[in-house]
Amino acid sequence: MLYMEKAKEKWCAALAVFVCGFMAHGYFFTNKISYHDDSCYYFGVGMTFGSGRWALGLIQKVMNKVGFLNYSSSWWNGGLCILLTAVCAVLLVELLQIRQKSYAVLLGALLIAFPAMASLFAYMFTAPYYMFAVLLMIVAVYTAVRYPYGYLPAIVIIAFSMGIYQTYFGVATSLFVLILLRDMEDRSFAQNVMEAFKYLFTLLGGMLLYFLCNRVCIKIFQITLVEYQGINNMANVTMRSLIGSVKRAYLGFFQPIFQDLCGISSHRTIRFLSLIHISEPTRLALIS
């Protein structure tokens, strides 16, 4: 009976993804809209090994071997993304232990209607591959959290996901932090520290394995990494560069309060609302 109740919440999340997905992105699916790279890669997956996306390159080679032609189809690729997002929602309901149908629906709706999804669909030629990378990150976290030695396969899964698209490393990181915060009160301080180090080890292990596989693929396929966004220097990390990255992150976070950010906060009202939005968590923390 309890399993059936949990299944209902998962079905609610998945259904919310399908309904809200087609409502929010139906215009993309019923029209062919190309931005930037999508205009150039109708029949490809874009930069692979040269951008450090060795897993995407390997997937493309396998697809070519079996005769599968990649095409930037709005309906096919968009539908695959909706399906993959629904699977993500189901896993997140279980992972975050959501026990109310309304919250499950909200999770599914937010997951598919988030602005990053609209950006993803702008590059429809590679959208399902990138969504698959998101799913892999969630699977990695689920495996590491649910099973005693799950961090070992999780390391491999994280590395492969980063090999498709490096950006989604933040998905695993954020989920680990959320789970630590959720379980903090139910464990002792020592147990919390042990769990934190296990998750940190999993993340670092996945990143190191990604770089190792990237180096191997570069050697095998005789590829040179491109300079775009500093990809050719992504493994050259120093303490100074880390401090600089943290500084830029905080400056970028608070920038909408003080000045315009890409046209988003050009009006004073928007800046004031940004200030309220940023300061609200601090106020709630002080009250509690």
Please provide the spans of the model-predicted regions.
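Transmembrane alpha-helices of multi-pass, membrane-embedded glycan-processing enzymes
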Residues: 60-64, 76-91, 129, 133-136, ...
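Membrane-interface micro-motifs in multi-pass membrane enzymes
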Residues: 49, 53, 77-83, 102-145, ...
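Perimembrane helix-loop-helix junctions
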Residues: 171-204
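Membrane-lumen/periplasm interface segments of multi-pass, membrane-embedded glycan/lipid transferases
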Residues: 21, 29-73, 196-275, 279
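Start-transfer (signal-anchor) and selected internal transmembrane alpha helices
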Residues: 1-22
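Single conserved hydrophobic/aromatic residue that forms the stacking wall/gate
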Residues: 276-288
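Transmembrane helix irregularities
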Residues: 113, 156-172, 204, 209, ...
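Specific aromatic-rich, kink-prone transmembrane helix
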Residues: 131-148, 153-158, 175-184
